Amino acid sequence: LWCFDPTLEQWAWMGGGQGLSWAGHYGIKGMSSPDNLPRGRGYAPAMWCDAVGDLWLFGGQSGDEYNDLWKYEMTNGSWTWMHGDSTGLSTGSYGIIGVADPSNEPPCRSEIIGT
């Protein structure tokens, strides 16, 4: 994970593996841990910040495509694996259109464009 300081116009490496091919450490779904780390990926995973400033990461690709959802807590610098598979190429589980369900899961995605 990298952080850009626009005032200094410099990057700081905040942690994580080097390169796109590190395996990551998934830990237990829903539990934050300083040992958790999403696997390396590229090809435009979706990323956004929520109202409290946490960073979210979904999908991407490095060999396989992924559908895992991660949250990075800025306050303590730890990752939480929130949803999705720890392996690539998941076909997802669609459920009923418009109905939220804990078993629903989007399939793997890469080259994601969003706002």
Can you describe what each PLM-predicted range is?
Residues 1-115:
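Kelch-like beta-propeller repeat domains
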